[in-house]
């Protein structure tokens, strides 16, 4: 068999698929000897997710030739949700274009692969002026605090700290996080920067990955896309790009 990947538990794969499901209904994965990658953009081209999962993250990994396989995310999600936390999950591709999913020692599923309609999506090439690293639990709470009153998050970064704010019809919210705050793991500001981003996109991706990620890094500049990196122990890279809100 040309391709087979086995996880030691189910949490990482669930986090990846949950993150992808916030943006797209169909996903095309690329498997090589180095690992599995995915890159996709939502239909409105507001958000992009880029995932790299190295072979070293798997309990067992085999890929003797490059392969692309496309799946419907809702179908894939239903199956991997049947796995308990400690269950291993093995995915492989059969000769008759089926994705084989083995869960634990006694569950076996097959789903039909779909034709890939994905095109190569380049990553934004941006030089950022502000970089913030926070505990994921703290960032998720901040987003929830702002979403109580607003659909958008405004981030203002200064060398001394960061303000997360939002404004809506019902009121306003502002959360200040100083550079020496326990939740602030790192702060680098070349230039004071401000950006406003949709919580409709940002909140679901943070919730999806949050449980598996210890920290989150946000990079932005004035009126530039937000770049979010999740640090997950067994996953090489999850990057999320979100276009800024443009004031009319």
Curated annotation (Swiss-Prot):
InterPro entries: DNA_clamp_sf (IPR046938), Pr_cel_nuc_antig (IPR000730), Pr_cel_nuc_antig_C (IPR022649), Pr_cel_nuc_antig_N (IPR022648). GO terms for molecular function: DNA binding; DNA polymerase processivity factor activity. The keyword DNA-binding applies. Keywords: DNA replication, DNA-binding. This is DNA polymerase sliding clamp. Homotrimer. The subunits circularize to form a toroid; DNA passes through its center. Replication factor C (RFC) is required to load the toroid on the DNA. Sliding clamp subunit that acts as a moving platform for DNA processing. Responsible for tethering the catalytic subunit of DNA polymerase and other proteins to DNA during high-speed replication. It comes from the Archaea. It comes from Cenarchaeum symbiosum (strain A). One of its GO terms (biological process) is leading strand elongation. Belongs to the PCNA family.
């Amino acid at each position: 068999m040309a391709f087979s990947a086995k996880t030691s538990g189910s949490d990482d794969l669930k986090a990846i698929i949950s993150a992808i499901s916030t943006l797209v209904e169909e996903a095309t994965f690329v498997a090589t000897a180095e690992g599995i990658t995915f890159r996709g953009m939502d239909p409105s081209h507001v958000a992009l997710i880029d995932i790299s999962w190295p072979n070293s993250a798997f309990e067992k990994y085999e890929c003797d030739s490059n392969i692309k396989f496309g799946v419907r995310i809702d179908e894939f999600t239903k199956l991997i949700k049947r796995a308990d936390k400690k269950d291993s999950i093995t995915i492989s591709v059969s000769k008759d274009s089926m994705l084989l999913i083995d869960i634990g020692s006694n569950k076996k599923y097959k789903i039909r692969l779909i034709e890939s309609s994905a095109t190569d999506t380049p990553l934004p090439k941006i030089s950022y002026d502000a970089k913030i690293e926070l505990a994921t639990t703290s960032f998720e709470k901040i987003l929830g605090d702002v979403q109580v009153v607003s659909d958008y998050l405004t981030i203002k970064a200064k060398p001394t700290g960061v303000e997360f704010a939002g404004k809506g019809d019902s009121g306003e919210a502002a959360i200040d996080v100083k550079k020496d705050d326990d939740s602030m793991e790192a702060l680098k500001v070349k230039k004071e920067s401000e950006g406003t981003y949709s919580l409709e996109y940002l909140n679901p991706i943070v919730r999806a990955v949050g449980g598996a990620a210890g920290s989150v890094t946000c990079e932005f500049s004035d009126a530039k896309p937000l770049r979010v990196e999740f640090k997950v122990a067994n996953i090489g890279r999850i990057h999320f790009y979100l276009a800024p809100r443009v004031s009319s």
